[in-house]
Amino acid sequence: MGRTLYDKVWDDHVVDQQEDGTCLIYIDRHLVHEVTSPQAFEGLRNAGRKVRRPDCTLATVDHNIPTTPRKNFKNVSTFIQEADSRTQCETLEHNVKEFGLTYFGMDDSRQGIVHVIGPEQGFTLPGCTVNCGDSHTSTHGAFGALAFGIGTSEVEHVLATQTLLQKKSKNMRVKVDGKLAPGVTSKDIVLHIIGVIGTAGGTGCVIEFCGSAFEQMSMEARMSVCNMSIEAGARAGMIAPDETTFEYIRGRPLAPTGAEWDKAVEYWRSLRSDPDAKYDVDVFIDAADIAPTLTWGTSPQDVVAITGTTPDPSTVSDPIRRQAMERALDYIGLKPNTPMQEVKIDKVFIGSCTNSRIEDLRAAAAIAKGRHVADWVYAMVVPGSGLVKKQAEQEGLDRIFKEAGFDWREAGCSMCLGMNPDQLKPGERCASTSNRNFEGRQGAGGRTHLMSPAMAAAAAVTGYFTDVRKLTPAQQDRPASPTPKKIETELEPPVEDHAKAADQADIVTDAPATGASPPSPAPSDAAGMPKFTTLRGYAAPLDIANVDTDMIIPKQFLKTIKRTGLGTALFYNIRFDGATGEENPDFVLNQEPYRQSRILVCTGPNFGCGSSREHAPWAFNDFGIRSIIAPSFADIFFNNCFKNGMLPITLPQDKVEMLAEHAKQKAELEVDLVNQVVRYPGGEVPFDVEPFRKHCLVNGLDDIGLTMQKADLIEAFEAKRSQTWPWLDGKDYAGKATKFTPVATNTAKKQKLDW
């Protein structure tokens, strides 16, 4: 039987396979940043372990850094004002020096967002495996790479062993054929796809995007699509490499050359899915059905055409979906049936790992040219890397933006997640080219609407969500739309002064303290986990669908270099009043006996969707909750739970609702992992768990220690890899799996990469 693109890449990276199907796969490329790596390096240090393949590892700072001008930059210690952010960046600089890793610091023109710098350096190549402690690692799948985000425990695992323990996902194909309408971009396509299949539509799968719509895309457009495959619940997204791919890679600093290039291209051509390959899930979409699209709510699946209106929850029969829709409309400050083009905005963000590349900036500049940002709008453009910024300035794009009233910034993640100074204030509405519109994602109380760079630029110059086709040359002879009326959304008055708005964009505050109980013991950083056999206690009931990682632990609590102390941050935005820090008495964890909960029962599906950050399970562990029961889980969160000695249990909807009713009656539940049952007063419910994961939990085993027992298999694979795919090794690797070549952070831009 034929194989898919995913099958082929997976098969070429299996180091070992266990009886239950768990595989040890080799990781070719590892990207590291400041937020999800400190605890991983600490684990290596405590266990006396080294980084196995420095030549396959690349580090940079992106999430926490300011995007203000760097003309007076000396070092991160003096430049980054916010203490926790500064500590994370300083810690990364210390770690890359100690462990001998290549690092693009803030004084290096190559610094930028991890998922921008990997491709532009030629670090990302077709057919390779790519990991990063960031869920949008799926971006690199645009090259035909198997790329997926991992948690901090797995970051440590890759650093130590250059491998991961994984179960193979299902194959899913999303095919988009036909002629695209004018004004429709890759961002519109992927938002439309997510709207069709939902944020859990790809759960348990790797999506292969195919069809004429993707074949005609540039590499940068393909990256935007694969970037957001995680928002559809998929483990990864992939597009088969072709001539467009090869031309993009050719000549990049880390791309193969000469005979190696020819051999590489021959291999890359072989990766395309076979004609008779079988897929577990097939989705077909007519390109003609896709219009310029944006989000209306607080989930990437809450999408609507720019010509459409917000939905009406009263027409939805499913109570969980109706409740989620009502909650989203309430948070976003819009009423049912509101025309999207009548919604007034406050800010515009053009940037993020989804849309901060040169083509994105060109598209936005084409709309901005000759126009000006609306008087009440603050608009910012944040290039994805120093090299993108430099190229844009060479093309004069910066002048177009500045003349139009946009703020032209330095490279970084910026307002995508508001961990840095670039944030929304409560009530502010933002047209954003980023990838997530969760509650509080861009700042507490901020209202995020996702869209393409061209659509964001159109919103900036009109002050309202606008059909970009009205502003493009081919559409200028169309009759003008009626003057949009302002929608009353209970916003705070918008900032009128642009200088003042820019200053406010740089305000960041520390996480507020709370009076919650002290944290419970957490797993050791060095090795091993507490054993999990049985767990008895109160179970907190929660009736929310699509509980995302930003809801579980808001971004302001991610700026830590430890795994502990996060119990007070669990569900902070709905557990506490953001302004006063006072408890919300209506939230279940603030009620007795649920303050002592050891189990959580959530009746809504897709629990833990969103980021790969391991801070979410750390927060649960620190609070004292070690088991979560739900109808379904997002893949990365599900995996991260096991890495932290926690047990996520998937049960049918009716069983979850039954257990939730017992929880609401304040009855204790018992999770018996050994016998694989959940006991409740008068009965029990069986559950499934993978044998290897059960074995590790029951015995408190350390994945890294287990993997290191297979050193001979890893070494044999590396020898085969060097012979078969030599372009994947660093230039001076020569079989030396622990070679270190430190790169001093203050001279990185002057040194030639020793790969």
Swiss-Prot record:
CC terms in the record's Gene Ontology section: 3-isopropylmalate dehydratase complex
Q: What is its EC number?
A: 4.2.1.33
Enzyme type, top EC level = lyase
Obligatory cofactor(s): [4Fe-4S] cluster
Question: GO MF annotations for this entry?
Answer: 3-isopropylmalate dehydratase activity; 4 iron, 4 sulfur cluster binding; metal ion binding
The biological pathway it contributes to is: Amino-acid biosynthesis; L-leucine biosynthesis; L-leucine from 3-methyl-2-oxobutanoate: step 2/4
The GO annotation for biological process reads: L-leucine biosynthetic process
Query: Per the annotation, how and in what number is the cofactor bound?
Result: Binds 1 [4Fe-4S] cluster per subunit.
Q: Which reaction does it catalyse?
A: (2R,3S)-3-isopropylmalate = (2S)-2-isopropylmalate
The protein's UniProt keywords, in alphabetical order, are:
4Fe-4S, Amino-acid biosynthesis, Branched-chain amino acid biosynthesis, Iron, Iron-sulfur, Leucine biosynthesis, Lyase, Metal-binding
Q: Which HAMAP family does the UniProt record give?
A: LeuC_type1, LeuD_type1
Quaternary structure, from the entry: Monomer.
Q: Which PANTHER family match?
A: 3-ISOPROPYLMALATE DEHYDRATASE, HOMOACONITASE, MITOCHONDRIAL-RELATED
Summary of the function given for this chain in its UniProt record? Catalyzes the isomerization between 2-isopropylmalate and 3-isopropylmalate, via the formation of 2-isopropylmaleate.
What is the protein name for this chain? 3-isopropylmalate dehydratase
User: Gene of origin?
Assistant: LEUA
